[in-house]
Amino acid sequence: MAATDIARQVGEGCRTVPLAGHVGFDSLPDQLVNKSVSQGFCFNILCVGETGLGKSTLMDTLFNTKFEGEPATHTQPGVQLQSNTYDLQESNVRLKLTIVSTVGFGDQINKEDSYKPIVEFIDAQFEAYLQEELKIRRVLHTYHDSRIHVCLYFIAPTGHSLKSLDLVTMKKLDSKVNIIPIIAKADAISKSELTKFKIKITSELVSNGVQIYQFPTDDESVAEINGTMNAHLPFAVIGSTEELKIGNKMMRARQYPWGTVQVENEAHCDFVKLREMLIRVNMEDLREQTHTRHYELYRRCKLEEMGFKDTDPDSKPFSLQETYEAKRNEFLGELQKKEEEMRQMFVQRVKEKEAELKEAEKELHEKFDRLKKLHQDEKKKLEDKKKSLDDEVNAFKQRKTAAELLQSQGSQAGGSQTLKRDKEKKNNPWLCTE
């Protein structure tokens, strides 16, 4: 189709309509480029690998700068993810680069759950983006996208095979992120061992079903180079920020007693291949794959968990509005059911409480009757005792009165006899001599 042609949808097909002159929509690519350049780009790299494999050094070498960061130790109690964001600019293109490092990965005795913090971190970035998408007022053009676009998995240069930790971790990550395996510190093993090691790694990845990122070959402009580079995976890399004079040029290299290893010499390592594939050729594809494949998978699973689906049980198309109405009706039904259950529960509890109160009231009445009867019995006993005491008091008073009366009568009789005797003595003097 010519550049000045236009395709218009008509029914199920379309027809090509020639233009009589220049319209101007051929500038759309330029408009898109200008808009993208003005907004800037973001790229997020996750570096996974054991401590001491040169992850930070390789990042410095890849972007030809010195990133500030604290060196990790082997004494971490668990795996921690450390994220640092940098603003870079090359020509008029701005890049917001985020580098996430797995501090303490592989340093623990028990490495069984070492992959979990990494998976949780990746999911957390997906969740943050999903929540931003679900907002009523979205501002995705200003939102800092923190989703991981590529995972550089650093493999220790043992020269034998992949560790179980590496296989398990990559298997857990392959459905969530684009994985590019790389052999770190490739100058630690010989060239023949390195070739065998690459073959062994590829074989183990295939046999264990680990899906690593394949450079796309559907674009004719990069199909050939990407197809060639896919055959070189995993890349064997060396990192160095030190510049040495080799011949008449200053080159990044490592100096050893036996010679010099040049970082950007493809005969020495695959650093240049990695940089070309990661940054110059496939950076945008990595960003696109993250959004269209990994994020969409996470989003679909999350929406399905929430009850949203594209089809009904009969595999018929199901619109979002229908899904919403179905979920709303389902929710209202559940709400009514819960309300009815709560009402029944409330009524049951009221009945139980009423029964308890009636039983308590009955017990109180019985207790009151017992106490009342006991009170009456005690009152009767006290009244009987009081009556008895009153009778005793009255009898005592009567006896006292009689005794006083007898005493007074005795006193009067004794006085009369004394007067009579005195009178007789007076009349009869002989009685005095007696």
From Swiss-Prot:
<comment type="subunit">
    <text>(Microbial infection) Interacts with HCV NS5B.</text>
</comment>
<dbReference type="GO" id="GO:0000776">
    <property type="term" value="C:kinetochore"/>
</dbReference>
<keyword id="KW-0744">Spermatogenesis</keyword>
<keyword id="KW-0158">Chromosome</keyword>
<protein>
    <recommendedName>
        <fullName>Septin-6</fullName>
    </recommendedName>
</protein>
<feature type="binding site">
    <location>
        <position position="104"/>
    </location>
    <ligand>
        <name>GTP</name>
    </ligand>
</feature>
<keyword id="KW-0206">Cytoskeleton</keyword>
<keyword id="KW-0342">GTP-binding</keyword>
<feature type="modified residue" description="Phosphoserine">
    <location>
        <position position="416"/>
    </location>
</feature>
<feature type="coiled-coil region">
    <location>
        <begin position="321"/>
        <end position="409"/>
    </location>
</feature>
<feature type="modified residue" description="N-acetylalanine">
    <location>
        <position position="2"/>
    </location>
</feature>
<dbReference type="GO" id="GO:0030496">
    <property type="term" value="C:midbody"/>
</dbReference>
<keyword id="KW-0597">Phosphoprotein</keyword>
<keyword id="KW-0132">Cell division</keyword>
<keyword id="KW-0137">Centromere</keyword>
<keyword id="KW-0547">Nucleotide-binding</keyword>
<dbReference type="GO" id="GO:0008021">
    <property type="term" value="C:synaptic vesicle"/>
</dbReference>
<dbReference type="GO" id="GO:0060090">
    <property type="term" value="F:molecular adaptor activity"/>
</dbReference>
<dbReference type="GO" id="GO:0097227">
    <property type="term" value="C:sperm annulus"/>
</dbReference>
<keyword id="KW-0945">Host-virus interaction</keyword>
<feature type="binding site">
    <location>
        <begin position="185"/>
        <end position="193"/>
    </location>
    <ligand>
        <name>GTP</name>
    </ligand>
</feature>
<dbReference type="InterPro" id="IPR027417">
    <property type="entry name" value="P-loop_NTPase"/>
</dbReference>
<dbReference type="GO" id="GO:0005940">
    <property type="term" value="C:septin ring"/>
</dbReference>
<dbReference type="GO" id="GO:0032173">
    <property type="term" value="C:septin collar"/>
</dbReference>
<keyword id="KW-0995">Kinetochore</keyword>
<dbReference type="InterPro" id="IPR030379">
    <property type="entry name" value="G_SEPTIN_dom"/>
</dbReference>
<dbReference type="GO" id="GO:0007283">
    <property type="term" value="P:spermatogenesis"/>
</dbReference>
<dbReference type="GO" id="GO:0031105">
    <property type="term" value="C:septin complex"/>
</dbReference>
<feature type="modified residue" description="Phosphothreonine">
    <location>
        <position position="418"/>
    </location>
</feature>
<feature type="region of interest" description="G3 motif">
    <location>
        <begin position="101"/>
        <end position="104"/>
    </location>
</feature>
<dbReference type="GO" id="GO:0008104">
    <property type="term" value="P:protein localization"/>
</dbReference>
<feature type="binding site">
    <location>
        <position position="239"/>
    </location>
    <ligand>
        <name>GTP</name>
    </ligand>
</feature>
<feature type="modified residue" description="Phosphoserine">
    <location>
        <position position="27"/>
    </location>
</feature>
<keyword id="KW-0969">Cilium</keyword>
<comment type="similarity">
    <text>Belongs to the TRAFAC class TrmE-Era-EngA-EngB-Septin-like GTPase superfamily. Septin GTPase family.</text>
</comment>
<feature type="binding site">
    <location>
        <position position="254"/>
    </location>
    <ligand>
        <name>GTP</name>
    </ligand>
</feature>
<dbReference type="GO" id="GO:0003924">
    <property type="term" value="F:GTPase activity"/>
</dbReference>
<feature type="region of interest" description="G4 motif">
    <location>
        <begin position="184"/>
        <end position="187"/>
    </location>
</feature>
<dbReference type="GO" id="GO:0061640">
    <property type="term" value="P:cytoskeleton-dependent cytokinesis"/>
</dbReference>
<dbReference type="GO" id="GO:0000281">
    <property type="term" value="P:mitotic cytokinesis"/>
</dbReference>
<keyword id="KW-0221">Differentiation</keyword>
<feature type="region of interest" description="Disordered">
    <location>
        <begin position="405"/>
        <end position="434"/>
    </location>
</feature>
